A protein has these predicted regions:
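ATP/Mg2+ or Mg2+-diphosphate-binding catalytic cores
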Residues: 202-234
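Active-site Asp-x-Gly
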Residues: 135-188
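An alpha-helical support segment within catalytic cores of ATP-dependent transferases
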Residues: 64-124
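Hydrophobic HxD+1 residue recognition
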Residues: 127
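Extended, well-ordered alpha-helical scaffold segments
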Residues: 49-52, 97-106, 213-225
Length: 234
């Protein structure tokens, strides 16, 4: 409905049909929104996509909280968002040694109260390239809304922060900042933090699944990140 009333400049999955399975359960078919997932090249040199993504995410984050809360989606305050990240780090640290430099960097950011003064907003919660449908530099649709909630808008920017070129990010940030109505001075700093903590989230996923290959991959990625950052604060 938000798209139909021009509140957001992108479409979302629309049900085209469904069928019951013989042994229980159902299959749901959604309409093809068109377009394709962005490539590495798109996130590097596309001249139009940064502004399109910036407008789209700002519009999503500008929606009233009630758009999500009214349909029963979870709602978290800024402090609750911070505490959820702390809990994730604590869970990982109980099982695996996180590089000390990363732990210090993240702990300092999580304890910096100025970073966690922001208005919670409707967020997608798990934006990655396969969730986006683009065509000729324009975002057509966003799918994969199973993690949607009211919370930290930086979470939706984290993947872009980690994947896009510096030039892309500069144009994206300019458009997002211009279009976003609420004041959130540190959203991009938190997005960087979220992009790094995503490795811990992957590690915890491996721990829950008892998948040694995922655990080892995540640990190696954390070690590489620690070397790249070389003790720098956020």
């Amino acid at each position: 409905q938000a798209h139909d009333h021009d509140y957001i400049p992108f479409d979302v999955p629309r049900l085209a049909g469904q069928a019951k399975l013989a042994h229980g359960g159902s299959v749901y078919v959604h309409r093809d929104p068109g377009g394709a997932a962005p490539t590495d090249e798109d996130l590097d040199t596309d001249p139009l996509l940064p502004a399109s993504l910036g407008r789209a995410l700002a519009a999503l984050h500008n929606l009233p909280e009630t758009v999500f809360s009214a349909i029963g989606l979870p709602t978290y305050t800024a402090i609750e968002c911070r505490d959820r990240n702390l809990a994730l780090l604590d869970e990982a640290a109980r099982e695996v040694t996180i590089p000390a430099a990363l732990w210090s960097r993240w702990e300092a950011a999580l304890e910096d109260v100025s970073l966690w003064r922001f208005p919670a907003a409707p967020v997608h919660g798990d934006i990655q390239e396969h969730c986006l449908s683009i065509k000729r530099g324009s975002l057509l649709a966003i799918s994969g809304w199973t993690s949607a909630h009211v919370g930290d808008p930086a979470l939706d920017i984290a993947w872009i922060q980690a994947s896009a070129s510096d030039a892309f990010l500069e144009r994206f940030r300019e458009t997002y900042g211009h279009e976003r109505r609420a004041t959130d001075l540190h959203v991009f700093t938190r997005a960087q933090l979220m992009s790094e903590i995503a490795l811990v989230r992957w590690l915890v996923h491996g721990l829950h699944a008892e998948d040694s290959s995922v655990i080892e991959e995540a640990r190696a990625m954390l070690d590489d990140l620690a070397k790249d950052l070389d003790g720098e604060p956020l």
